Amino acid sequence: MGNRNYLIEGVSCTGKTTVCNELQRRGFHAIHGDRELAYQGDPETGTRTDTATHQNHIWHVDKVKALIANSDEEVTFFCGGSRNFSKFIDLFDAVFVLDVDIDTLNRRLIERPEKEFGGKISERELIVRLHHTKEDIPRDGILIDATAPIQHVVDAIFQETEEK
């Protein structure tokens, strides 16, 4: 939906939703991908699945492509995580990966409500493993230190977009 489109990724509890909220507060067009684009499906085929698992948390590729093709907005930020990002990552002008140290991650996980992903112990263990392995986030993204206050995190993203 923008002339310039940016993806903001990262493991759970790195601040993707908070960054999206701050971008919207500042008046930017920012899409909560996990709320607006996500569903449970096969990451390769897109076929819907009946089970709710982390591995099947994917985005509607056609919706992502349509939003990127629409140039009504000068800049659009897509915030969230998906297991099928490889199907559309090349459409973005830049990809940012939010990262935090393990102590910050553990603190945020403890604070997470049980009803949200990461609120259960088994989910926390998965998130900590994914934090260590980086296996389901873009490898070539621009790392953003998301341990800082949210205003500084968003400022760091803006600084990187100006350099592109």
What are these regions (language model features)?
Residues G15:
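Conserved glycine(s) of the Walker
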Residues F85, E114-Q159, E163-K164:
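Small-molecule kinase domains that catalyze NTP-dependent phosphoryl transfer to phosphate-bearing small molecules
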Residues D72-F77:
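Loop/turn-to-beta-strand initiation segments
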Residues L91-E111:
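Conserved phosphate-donor/acceptor-positioning beta-strand/loop module used by diverse small-molecule
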Residues N21-V64:
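Conserved substrate/cofactor phosphate-moiety recognition/catalytic segment
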Residues G10:
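The Walker A (P-loop) glycine that initiates the GxxxxGKT/S ATP-binding motif of P-loop NTPases
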Residues T18:
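Conserved Walker
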